[in-house]
A protein has these predicted regions:
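Acidic/histidine-rich helix-loop elements
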Residues: 10, 35-43, 72-76, 155
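Serine-esterase "nucleophile elbow" of acetyl-processing enzymes
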Residues: 1-40, 50-59
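Ser/Thr-centric signal marking residues that sit
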Residues: 6, 43-44, 81
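A short linear-motif detector with a strong N-terminal bias
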Residues: 15, 43-44, 135-136
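Alpha-helical cap/lid subdomain in secreted, periplasmic
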Residues: 30, 48-179
Length: 179
């Protein structure tokens, strides 16, 4: 469950990190079906409102939550973002799923204090709910010395070249959950 970073925004269908994850699972002889419930532009509030129906419909063993970036870009209250992430993790766990939370960072123009608080919210949710966490989903992309090579012209959405890196950021932590 995610936003445009997982919904293949601006990419050729089948080239995003979630599609690459399905291929990786097959290569590893792990028979899991991946359901991409990501919507471009989604916030944690949107994800929270959709999650119960998705859990009921798909009855997943694992839920990856990649949300929060749009909350930050829209300047939504941090407490609301954290509460929504916490609620989603709890709901997924109550439905019997293991949760993997993908952390994000705020753009630097929001100031260092807000950026630290935003990043800390993901750690707090993971600690409170005892979920797995990828601290920064865009590690090696958003913090690359030459980040423009990894982004579409809008400088927000990772391009096709970044997708394998995004999967590489998720895979080690997810693989531990799948065993």
């Amino acid at each position: 469950m995610g936003d445009s970073l997982s919904a293949e925004y601006g990419l050729t269908r089948g080239t995003g990190w979630v599609a690459l994850l399905q291929k990786k699972l097959a290569q590893e002889n792990l028979s899991f079906e991946v359901v991409n419930a990501s919507i471009s532009g989604d916030t944690t509030s949107g994800g929270r409102s959709r999650l119960a129906a998705l859990l009921k419909k798909h009855q997943p063993n694992h839920v990856i939550i990649e949300l929060g970036g749009n909350d930050a870009l829209r300047g939504l209250p941090l407490k609301m973002t954290e509460d929504n992430l916490l609620n989603m993790a709890r709901a997924a766990q109550a439905a019997g799923a293991q949760v993997l939370l993908l952390g994000m960072q705020m753009p630097p123009n929001y100031g260092p204090d807000m950026a630290r608080q935003f990043e800390a919210a993901f750690f707090q949710v993971a600690k409170t709910q005892k979920t797995a966490l990828v601290p920064f989903f865009l590690q090696g992309i958003g913090d690359d010395p030459e980040p423009l090579k990894w982004f579409q012209p809008d400088r927000i959405h990772p391009n096709e070249a970044a997708q394998p890196r995004m999967l590489a950021n998720v895979w080690p932590t997810l693989k531990k959950q799948l065993k």
